[in-house]
Amino acid sequence: NRNKSVLVLCPKKLSENWNTYKGNYINNPIATDRLRYDVLYHTDLSREHGQSNGIDLDRLNWGNYDLVVIDESHNFRNGGEVSGEDAKENRYLKLLNKVVRAGVRTKVLMLSATPVNNKFIDLKNQLALAYEGDASQMNKKLDTTKSIDEIFRQAQKAFNAWSKLPADERTTDELLRTLDFDFFELLDSVTIARSRKHIEKYYNTSDIGKFPERLPPISLRPCLTDLNDAINYNDIYNLLMSLSLTIYTPSNYIMPSKLAKYIDITHHKGNSLTQQGREEGIRRLMSINLLKRLESSVASFRLTIDRIKKLINDTIGTIKNYQSGDCVLNLTEISGAEDFDYDDQNTDFFSVGKKIKIDLADMDYVSWMRELEKDAENLELLSVMIADITPEHDTKLQTLFDLIRKKIEQPINPGNKKIIIFTAFSDTADYLFANVSKFAKENFGLETAEITGTVDGKATIPKLRADLNTVLTCFSPVSKGKSVLLPGSTDELDILIATDCISEGQNLQDCDYLINYDVHWNPVRIIQRFGRIDRIGSKNDHIQLVNFWPDMDLDEYINLKSRVETRMKISVMTSTGDDDLINAEEKGDLEYRRAQLKRLQEEVVDIEDMTSGISIMDLGLNEFRLDLLEYMKRHEDIETAPKGLHTVVAQTEDAPAGVIFVLRNINNSVNIDNRNRIHPFYMVYISEEGEIACDYLNPKRLLDTMRLLCRGKGEPCAELCT
């Protein structure tokens, strides 16, 4: 009876995909298989009560699952720490403790297009879920000479050294030579990977459809407004740099003599994050977030300015009305996540913490109010400066209208009018929906929809059911099976405005035109968004990516973000002595982001190339083992085949004339430096000129080449054999 209890954990917006395949639904293509599994959301791990997807969380036995499938597992790549009795668990630790470690023995299957962002520790943290955070469990099962911790440490060290090489030396082959054999053995044991490039090159896609051709990306840099003598980006940035944002750090103003009263705020007590650290983290995020919001839209920036201004003014009012210490400040009132983008909302600053109150009598509220009043004055000035930028004078919005007009009048695929517009912020999505829906309806008779983290579905079609599944089905009817799901319905949506809540896992390839209305700070997000339409089986011959960039040089833009982070970091060190309060994503490698964002201005980068380094596609041999097992099922006589087999195939551009040798070392004990991954077999590719085209240390490349040369061929090429 093992493996009967299965849990699928996925982002909430992807639950319908999973529910379809287990339910008795007309659009379930595998209904006869009668799959049985529970579907819950990543966010449910932090919940103790209530209903979720028809399951009562109060009574759920989290520890009774034989298998847990984690969709979009990269959301758990930052890991977690356990220390002390009062350690507060983040989502990662909840999963580890409630599901994997508790109850019956649980196997873990993780699905992700981006398991590694820009460091190998991302992969290690995800793998730790499978071995319950106990490395000794994995070490016993691996055929390696080193522990898993040492393997990843050495791999990251090799990668760091390789990344500093000159560009012409920083090749995949060079990195493969420096990585330890045990690292390959580890990945080969636990990963199976496929990429777009790999499928296109080595697989026959005639049965499942092709990938569409990517047109060169369009990069646009509209100015802020067409108003004469109006404020520009640099004017706003200078004002933003003057903000202290101490509204987010009240605990820094607790008087030293009163600190003992608030020991929970100022000391770790085993927690990985103190309340002071959490406040500083939110303050730093908000300082950077103001830049992000401005780059997204004037409307989004204005709303955030107004919210912070109201928060400050309300707090100043509370201080002024303070009498005899009977007034307390509730910190949770000033730590809401609604102003932040999808990634920032998932940091521990918002998911970890408890209600804490500070008595104003215990604060140096005079100094605090002085700083608050300075910020209030500058925010009011900002508010006045952008007040005149209405939609009519919003150059970025008007540029978007021009794009839509051109796309409709000159479609890149015959008759296809569909457009997806992505933004990082729901406020920008609301602003775009209000204006784009009116423009598209009045000028072209097109229907528009919106999906955000808080809006499951909103559309201009009267009486259309406003839920995620219906909206996506009406927007991408072929890929979503509308003819089965909504038979007889003529409702169709042509423009979809969305946040990153649907940037993962959705098949929307009926659409051929995707606009990034704001460029996400994490370059991987940009490619994930484009992946909604850049999918195998697309009905479109061509697809187009459009990116809106800030109205300034990219280096200047990235340096600006660096200056803001540095300024906030200095203030953190001054107040707390701690310079490591922000999450790994936000620390980021600015050079990595700079390089990738520059590439994205000129080309559409494959997601496996986004690390400027290596894809796990370059490492694993698992797929060849699967090919071999399948071949042996069909050809049982392979065991009696004579030695010395050979054949002849035509050369190609990637495989010039020569010989690929597959040899066997008769001495099994000899494997120099333990570097040959397929010992005792050795492969080498020698060109017609006698040069080594590929040596035995890169069997993955040789096996890929052989597969490509032999694909679709059952007999030797007679012309070449004569």
Regions found by a protein language model. Name each.
Residues 37-68, 72-115, 122, 132-334, ...:
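Inter-lobe coupling linker of SF2 helicases/translocases
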